[in-house]
Amino acid sequence: MIKRKIWCNLCIDLVAFTSEIFKGAVFQSLDGIVVSANCKLRKIFTLKSKPQDTADKDAVCGVPFSTDEPTDIIPRSCQLMTDVPHVTQLLNMTKLRQTEIKFGGHPLRSAESDQFINRGTGSTRNSKNQDVCHIAFGSKVLGPPPLSGRRSNMRISSETVRSVGSKNNRSCQPSTVEKHVNGTEMSALLIPESEEQGNKENIHHIKQTVPIHAANLPIMHPHPPQEPSADKNNNRRRLRLKSTSRERTETPSGNSSGNNTNEVKAATVLTTVSQQEAGLLNSSTLGPQSPDQSDEWIFPENADHVSYLASSRQSLLLDDDSCHPSHLWLEASKESEHDQQAEESQSVPKDIFTFSSRPRSAPHGKTQTMSPEEVSFILDLKEDNSVTSRDTQSEDDFYGGDSSEEGDHSIQGSRGPTTGPSELTQLTSESLLGEAAKRTSKEYLKSAYTEAGATESQDSSAEQIDRNNFQMSSLPTTCFSPTGRRCGSCQKTPDPVIKAKDLPAQQVPASLNKTSLKEISGERLSSIPEASEYDWRNYQPSQMSESELQMLASLRRQQNEELEDAGTSHGLSASQVDNCNVSISTSSDDTTTWNSCLPPPVNQGHHYQKEMNPPSPSNPRDWLNMLSPPIVPPSQQPAEQRPDSSESLSVQGEEDLSVEEDEEVLTLLYDPCLDCYFDPQTGKYYELV
């Protein structure tokens, strides 16, 4: 019936099969395909009309091809090369009936095909139930239900009914059990629910114990076996194409099992060539992949050992609003590995990528997660410019899922030279799908990405990269920053030395020569009017503005994560714990911390880490109940302050890299309220000479 040893574009007319098998039904769409045969599939696609049948009419079916129907041309990207011998065959009910008569059988009537196709419902339905209408795979079909008892049902499904060509050949040869497959076979039946449970244990077996001496590759209608099979649970391997939200096993012959009453015209083209060599079936070609095996993208140049299926939605499925007939094209190869590779370079364009997916049911209530391999491939696709808008939309579904919000999944915003999988995930979503703040409800990542982008041009040390890694923490943490306060004197007395443009939300460390500095004594420090007016009780969080509370929340979380990474305890003094009583809950911290109207600060507060060490006698600020240099929000800063040319502001993150052995250079923090510089190492105050 179907030619062997040659490339074959097998077109299956699903419209004809649907209307003949299910009386009154109209074909609408194809939800899935089950391939159960010893063949290799090259491509699957749909056509609006039937292609021209180029096979030998007399040898194949004895029926001339009707030329009055509209024909379609196979797309250029899916055509075989002209120097490759191939045929195009069209299968419909008319040709099947003619083949039956030619090989001496009786023509298959619709009632018989209806009975065999729907035999699976008999085991679950009471045989006494003789309704005028019965349910065939979810659709109501006119006519009495098929008469099927359990014994005949088991006997029929044990061989998963052969078609005429294979049935005729097999009747001439002894049916002895062999350990190899000497031919090809494609099942034209949906496995009924009752039998599918029994067959599930044998799905992953590789050896096929039932002999198939078939000269052809049948994809025909079911027929009862002439003799019972030696193995009742035939080891059948199913390759499944997932397409729409409802998954079901579908045969190439078009026995659509879902909405048969709403089905639109389509025909399926199957390109298949049988394998000649006897031996074990290649489980990577046909067998379902094991559940722990991940899906993989297969490139044309290195995919010669895998039977891959182009399952992209735009090529496999009709759009919901399309009412045109379509074809499904399955190709199969018989060549050896070397010939396959040579032919693949001819027949498969370089820009066609395929994705092979293992059979599984659709997840309920869960979104899909991505493995790092798939994430890295998305980056390659972006460079290839081969991602369509539809693909990007599906990737958007991936990144909107739960995987980016797991508590222990660290999402890092750094762009270091070595990026882990979680960094890759975030960077990919940023480059493909917009800014990272839209990817997760943890909106404080927005500030992390802004900081990472702002310091990328100045970044010269690995420590800077490390400190830009802001990771998610699902627990509220203790505050490691001192309580900020409003600095009223900053706005009244602008300093000519330090201007506000270089003072983001924190004090920038300045490397100054010690010869240009003069230490301020304790008496002099206490005599400064701004310092004497300060009382920390006036600046508790209850009197803070919302923006200051937000900065404290972010700073506290930041410091806690940095110290957690280092594995050290916070070692706060009692005064710092008392002063930092900003209560932050997990829920409020997640979504309402940052408002888009506030510009996120650049790397705020990272230099405070030195002050978070356990209190020591060399740091009197811990014992004197004094606070660190205040956090000045951008709205509170004087607008006209700028640094003098006499001081050089070091790049943040190089603070530890400054020459601390040389006592002539000090790394100081400027305190605008006290109008002096503070040395976090010694706790001393300095002013410019």
UniProtKB/Swiss-Prot annotation:
Composition bias, Polar residues: 150-176, 343-359, 411-421
Domain of life: Eukaryota
Residue spans of biased composition, Low complexity class: 583-593
UniProt biased composition (Acidic residues): 394-405
Region (Disordered): 143-179, 217-236, 241-262, 333-424, 583-660
Protein name per its UniProtKB record: Protein CFAP20DC
Record gene name: CFAP20DC
